[in-house]
């Protein structure tokens, strides 16, 4: 069971705001003594931003994404941390189809994980039965990308 809210508001002919929110109470419906939580299903997810620009000239955006904490196993005894990432973009569109764009990903260099799992694994020197532990894909650190593109 859940609800989603998606909207976009045009403040000016060259500027818009958008916000997407989702809430869910994700559970397995059949009884299981292990638990009824769905691993990896966050209760809250949000994304939004401000975008500006016209067909030519300056353009840009500031965008944010949030994933709430989520159960990593069915009994909800192990949970992930929430994550919050902000990205920025600025550039210039020329009337000849050229575009110069600068992207700053993970603008605030958030030390968070893109995704987390919890399962048995075995590294050298660990017990033969393995060790239950978190397995993560960390968010990429702050990165800057410059793009020069042409449309023809």
What do the PLM-derived regions correspond to, one by one?
Residues 1, 40-46, 82-86, 140-144:
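Residues that define the transmembrane beta-barrel architecture of outer-membrane proteins
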Residues 1-73, 149-151:
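Gram-negative outer-membrane beta-barrel transporters
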Residues 17, 42-45, 75, 84-90, ...:
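Glycine-rich loops and low-complexity Gly/Arg-rich segments
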Residues 26, 36, 70, 83, ...:
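Flexible, active-site-adjacent loop/turn segments at secondary-structure boundaries
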Residues 33-41, 67-68, 77-82, 116-125:
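Flexible, surface-exposed loop regions and adjacent strand-edge segments
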Residues 73-79, 87-91, 105, 134:
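Short, glycine/charged-rich beta-strand-loop motifs at protein surfaces that mediate ligand recognition
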Residues 92-152:
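C-terminal beta-signal and adjacent terminal beta-strands/loops
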């Amino acid at each position: 069971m859940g609800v989603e809210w998606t909207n976009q508001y045009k403040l000016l002919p060259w500027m818009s705001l958008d916000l997407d929110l989702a809430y869910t109470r994700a559970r397995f419906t059949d009884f299981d003594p292990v638990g009824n939580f769905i691993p990896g299903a966050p209760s809250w997810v949000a994304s939004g931003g401000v975008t500006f620009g016209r067909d030519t000239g300056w353009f840009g955006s500031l965008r944010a994404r949030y994933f709430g904490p989520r159960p990593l196993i069915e009994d909800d005894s192990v949970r992930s941390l929430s994550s919050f990432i902000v990205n920025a973009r600025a550039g210039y569109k020329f009337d000849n189809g050229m575009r110069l764009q600068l992207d700053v990903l993970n603008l605030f260099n958030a030390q968070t994980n893109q995704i987390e799992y919890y399962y048995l694994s075995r590294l050298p020197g660990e017990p033969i039965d393995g060790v239950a532990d978190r397995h993560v894909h960390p968010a990429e650190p702050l990165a800057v990308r410059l793009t020069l593109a042409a449309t023809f």
